[in-house]
Design a protein with these regions (language model features):
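N-terminal helix-turn-helix DNA-binding core of bacterial DNA-binding proteins
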Residues: 20-59, 81-93
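Conserved acidic functional residues
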Residues: 30, 66, 99
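Canonical helix-turn-helix DNA-binding module
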Residues: 52-75
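Short, Lys/Arg-enriched C-terminal cap helix and immediately downstream tail that follows
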Residues: 75-76, 83
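Short linear functional motifs in flexible/disordered or boundary regions
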Residues: 48-49, 66, 106
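Sequence-pattern detector for short linear motifs
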Residues: 36, 63, 71-74, 88, ...
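Amphipathic alpha-helical dimerization/coiled-coil segments
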Residues: 2-21, 38-43, 80, 90-121
Length: 121
């Protein structure tokens, strides 16, 4: 049995200082990505969840794209646990760089069409 456990592999993301407002706004311009971030803020309570937890009925390649855009904008942190990608909102970094942005996401009303598709709760 190994004396230590290797840390999960963290996927590339910008530092808080490297987060760029146009990139963040572009990431949030898609209602599915906005709904993903909203769901993590509301239902994950700052914790980590697998990408499949979101429960979006879309092809895996589409979900991978949406999560990658959110991660590359600096909104989500992702790491690998085996074959599973685990994500969490980078609350502290986003609040530091763009104060009030996550409050706007929390206040956003998820469109009924997305709710019917099971995209957000």
């Amino acid at each position: 049995m190994p004396a230590h456990v290797d840390a999960p592999e963290r996927l590339p993301q910008p530092s808080a200082a490297e987060m760029d407002l146009p990139v963040v706004m572009d990431a949030l311009s898609d209602p599915i990505r906005l709904a993903i971030l909203h769901r993590y803020l509301v239902d994950a309570a700052g914790g980590e969840r697998s990408c499949g937890w979101v429960g979006i009925d879309r092809p895996k390649s589409t979900l991978t794209h949406h999560f990658r855009v959110l991660r590359e904008a600096g909104l989500l942190e992702q790491h690998l646990e085996g074959l599973t990608r685990v994500s969490r909102v980078r609350v502290e970094d986003v609040q530091q760089r763009f104060p009030g942005l996550l409050d706007l996401v929390l206040d956003w009303q998820v469109p009924a069409a997305l709710l019917r598709e099971g995209i957000a709760s």
